[in-house]
């Protein structure tokens, strides 16, 4: 897919990730949102390639093809953070985040309510991740951005509308 129509935004996100990687910053998170089919997942991969990182996607299904439970996906994310922290030039992509955290339309609110984890615990996970992560949602979160940790909010319809 051609993203030339958002070249400035693509360059901005790429520079942000390059600096974060070079300086080994922790807590680097980007939230992309937009309607289904707008190319959010492809854009995340393009950004990864442009920055020179390998993009690792958190699975949505088991090896048997069954949907993973929300907690299993978040556990996979935490494991990937630990494993990839030792691998330079890695980027995590967590797609379809609203399927995992459907209530409240926030990627973190329903997980917080259903798992018993507090907002503070979730924020700590985001603020301390060693590997930059791109979180992808088909809808805008319904929560003030400052209350879900260190996330660069980036929409895709059009970007920086």
Give the role of each language-model region.
Residues 2-30:
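Pre-Walker A (pre-P-loop) alpha-helix and adjacent loop at the N terminus of AAA/AAA+ ATPase modules
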Residues 23-43:
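Walker A/P-loop nucleotide-binding motif
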Residues 72-76, 105-128:
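Substrate-gripping "pore-loop 1 plus following alpha2 helix"
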Residues 87-92, 127-134:
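Loop/turn-to-beta-strand initiation segments
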Residues 95-97:
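Walker B catalytic acidic pair
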Residues 125, 137-151:
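Short regulatory helix/loop adjacent to the ATP-binding pocket of P-loop NTPases
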């Amino acid at each position: 897919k051609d993203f030339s129509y958002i070249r400035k935004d693509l360059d901005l996100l790429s520079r942000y990730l390059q600096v974060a990687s070079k300086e080994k910053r922790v807590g680097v998170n980007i939230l992309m949102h937009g309607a289904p089919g707008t190319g959010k997942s492809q854009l995340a991969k393009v950004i990864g390639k442009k920055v020179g990182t390998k993009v690792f996607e958190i699975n949505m299904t088991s090896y048997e093809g069954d949907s993973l439970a929300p907690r299993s996906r978040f556990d996979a994310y935490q494991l990937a953070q630990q494993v990839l922290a030792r691998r330079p030039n890695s980027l995590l992509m967590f797609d379809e985040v609203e399927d995992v955290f459907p209530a409240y339309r926030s990627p973190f609110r329903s997980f917080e309510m259903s798992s018993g984890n507090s907002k503070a615990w979730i924020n700590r996970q985001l603020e301390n991740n060693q590997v930059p992560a791109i979180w992808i949602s088909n809808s805008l979160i319904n929560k003030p951005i400052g209350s879900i940790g260190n996330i660069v909010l980036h929409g895709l319809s059009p970007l920086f509308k």
